[in-house]
Each structure stands twice: as structure tokens, then as C-alpha cells.
Amino acid sequence: HSIEGGAVAFHDPELKDLLYQLKNFGITGYEQVEYVGANGKMNEFQAAMGLCNLRHVDADIAKRKVLTERYRERLGGVEGIRLCKEKAGVRYNYAYMPVVFEGYGADRDEIFAALKEYNIFARKYFYPCINDYACYREQFSSDDTPVAKRIASEVLTLPLYPDLSLETVDEICDIIL
């Protein structure tokens, strides 16, 4: 990691200019803006932290893969628990472990609360649904996006980081199951 926000690494040199422009508000030249961009610049300290951590990326991904496989082994095939399908030919970074609780014996919020009792902090990603944010509520209704509304209430992202132990993954799964 590079402290806050992250970094981009890629193999395709043609992406360099595009990514530079996107991280600089979409500016492509003097008084020229071609893309909807953002302020994606980092300071020198963040860059140094990112460079120091870059050497650990492959090992961290390998550790996360082992942990993800354990979650899949324990939670896969359980009725009412849906895991994201992995696609052939895709190289995953195993950054997140999202789980959808749909028709399981406990709902997402009950699982969240049960884990919290054991000081295990899962995350309710995509919640609340973006069109329920105060700044959008008057323009949009989550009733207009029923699938997003449902998924926002069912997804729980379980802890997944390189130093997490298999024993802790098993404890998390035991609490859920």
C-alpha cells in the first residue's frame, strides 16, 4: 500500500499517458480537458511507501490467495451463502472477500453483529446504496435500482489481509456457520 489511495502498476506503456491524464483531472494539455478525471496525485512520502511495499506485492497476493481458498472451502456450497465466481484467465489480487447472504439462516446485519462481538470487523461494502446518500436522495430512489438495493443489504466483506491467520479465518467461518 501507499498509505492512502493506493498506486497503479501496469505492464502496458501505452497506458502511461492516459493514466497520467486521468489522475490529473483529465487534463491533456493547456486549457484542454478530455476526460472526467480526478486528483489522483500522491506526495513523495506516499510514493516512497508505495515503492518500499512494492517488493512485497507478490508474496502478499499469494498469502491472500491461500486465505481466500480457505474461506471458499469453508463457505462455498453453503445454502444461502454466495461467493463471487472466479473466472478462468483472470489474475486476481485477492484484495477483498465479499460474501452475499441471501436466504441464509441469518442476514448480513446479524452476521456483522455476531462477528463484531468477537472483535472481528467485517465491512458492509456498497452500503448504503449510493442513491440513498443524502446528496442524491432527492434526485434518485433506490427503488429504481432494486438489484443494487438488494445487494447493498446482503454483501458483507470478510477480513482479508496478508497477516491474517488460517486459524482466524476458521474462527470467522465458525461464527458464520
Name each model-derived stretch.
Residues 3-8:
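Glycine-rich phosphate-binding loop of ATP-grasp-fold ATP-dependent ligases
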Residues 11-177:
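PLP-dependent aminotransferase class I/II
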